[in-house]
Amino acid sequence: YHLGGPPVTLKLPPGTPAGRTMRARGKGAVRKDGTRGDLLVTVDVAVPQHLSSEAREALEAYRKATADEDPRAELFKAAKGA
């Protein structure tokens, strides 16, 4: 679906999970009064099915470099505080 106007670019915060909905204020469809509504964008993460050996090596290097980090720690902390 094309809303007209230039493409919209969103900057996603690091760690944004798949399924999160982001709002781009004033970037949506044109209303009857001529103003634009908000554009809601749902993050969809595409995971490659096949990796080249170079890409696989890069991911392995990244895994080793971040071995001490637990990306789920923040999720658990947020869930306990909610």
From Swiss-Prot:
GO terms for molecular function: metal ion binding; unfolded protein binding. It comes from the Bacteria. It is found in: Cytoplasm. Its main location: cytoplasm. Residues 1-33 are annotated as: Disordered. InterPro entries: DnaJ_C (IPR002939), HSP40/DnaJ_pept-bd (IPR008971). Coiled coil: none annotated. It holds the Pfam family DnaJ_C. Its cofactor is Zn(2+). Keywords: Chaperone, Cytoplasm, DNA replication, Metal-binding, Repeat, Stress response, Zinc. Binds 2 Zn(2+) ions per monomer. One of its GO terms (cellular component) is cytoplasm. One of its GO terms (biological process) is DNA replication. Participates actively in the response to hyperosmotic and heat shock by preventing the aggregation of stress-denatured proteins and by disaggregating proteins, also in an autonomous, DnaK-independent fashion. Unfolded proteins bind initially to DnaJ; upon interaction with the DnaJ-bound protein, DnaK hydrolyzes its bound ATP, resulting in the formation of a stable complex. GrpE releases ADP from DnaK; ATP binding to DnaK triggers the release of the substrate protein, thus completing the reaction cycle. Homodimer. Belongs to the DnaJ family. The J domain is necessary and sufficient to stimulate DnaK ATPase activity. Zinc center 1 plays an important role in the autonomous, DnaK-independent chaperone activity of DnaJ. Zinc center 2 is essential for interaction with DnaK and for DnaJ activity. This is Chaperone protein DnaJ 1. It comes from Streptomyces albus G. The gene is dnaJ1.
